[in-house]
Amino acid sequence: MDKEAKYVYIPDQEGNDVKFEVIIYFEIEKLKGQYIIATPAFEETDEAYAFKIFKDEDGSDIFIALEDDDEEFEMVLETYETLMNEDGLIEE
């Protein structure tokens, strides 16, 4: 994935591509994973979603939404909050 990408298209449950605005991209070495936090580009919402990035056999990015009740999600959330705090973008 282009780490500077502002938008990505992620298929919904019906297979329709939905445009998401990338809030932040980061890697977590401990999990050996790449992640984005993104929000739907054309919706007025305060909700953001965490996605893990995989590659398919053609090398294209596949974005898998993380469930908010697992350990990986918790680590991603902690990393996101730390990065945003370091950048001064959120306050505790």
Swiss-Prot record:
- Extract the InterPro entries matched here: UPF0473
> What family classification does the UniProt entry report for this protein?
Belongs to the UPF0473 family.
Q: What is this protein called?
A: UPF0473 protein Cbei_1107
Organism of this sequence: Clostridium beijerinckii (strain ATCC 51743 / NCIMB 8052) (Clostridium acetobutylicum)
Source taxonomy: Bacteria, Bacillati, Bacillota, Clostridia, Eubacteriales
